């Protein structure tokens, strides 16, 4: 039986407070989960809703990762900040990928570093 997980990918080039970082990760987790198939979402929930937070150096890397995930058929959510506190409105902060089968997500994220 396959395991399911979700990855949230952040940008190293943005310097966010811990609170802002946590909120952006939460937005990505929820938004990406809303795009998952009902079956994958249920299996992920049954397995404990495994999440991993990873990082990429730049926004360019984030967009490239989103495209890789799209080619694998993975649900994604690119999060843009509202600009009310620390960073300008529209700043792309994080990418949520999954939930989906771990082996499919790993094809896209295996070379990334943990936060």
From Swiss-Prot:
The keyword Ligase does not apply. Keywords: Cytoplasm, Hydrolase. Its main location: cytoplasm. It is found in: Cytoplasm. Signal peptide: none annotated. GO terms for biological process: translation. Its EC number is 3.1.1.29. CDD domains: PTH2. It catalyses: an N-acyl-L-alpha-aminoacyl-tRNA + H2O = an N-acyl-L-amino acid + a tRNA + H(+). It comes from the Archaea. Pfam families: PTH2. GO terms for molecular function: peptidyl-tRNA hydrolase activity. One of its GO terms (cellular component) is cytosol. The natural substrate for this enzyme may be peptidyl-tRNAs which drop off the ribosome during protein synthesis. Belongs to the PTH2 family. This is Peptidyl-tRNA hydrolase. The lineage of its organism: Archaea, Methanobacteriati, Methanobacteriota, Stenosarchaea group, Methanomicrobia. The gene is pth.
């Amino acid at each position: 039986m396959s395991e399911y997980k979700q990855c949230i990918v952040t940008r190293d080039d943005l310097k966010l407070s811990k609170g802002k970082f946590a909120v952006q990760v939460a937005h990505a987790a929820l938004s990406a989960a809303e795009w998952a198939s009902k079956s994958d979402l249920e299996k992920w929930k049954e397995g404990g809703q495994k999440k991993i937070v990873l990082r990429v150096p730049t926004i360019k890397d984030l967009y490239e990762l989103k495209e890789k995930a799209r080619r694998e058929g993975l649900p994604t959510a690119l999060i843009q900040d509202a600009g009310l506190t620390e960073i300008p409105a529209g700043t792309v902060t994080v990418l949520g990928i999954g939930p989906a089968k771990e082996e499919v997500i790993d094809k896209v994220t295996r070379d990334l570093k943990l936060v």
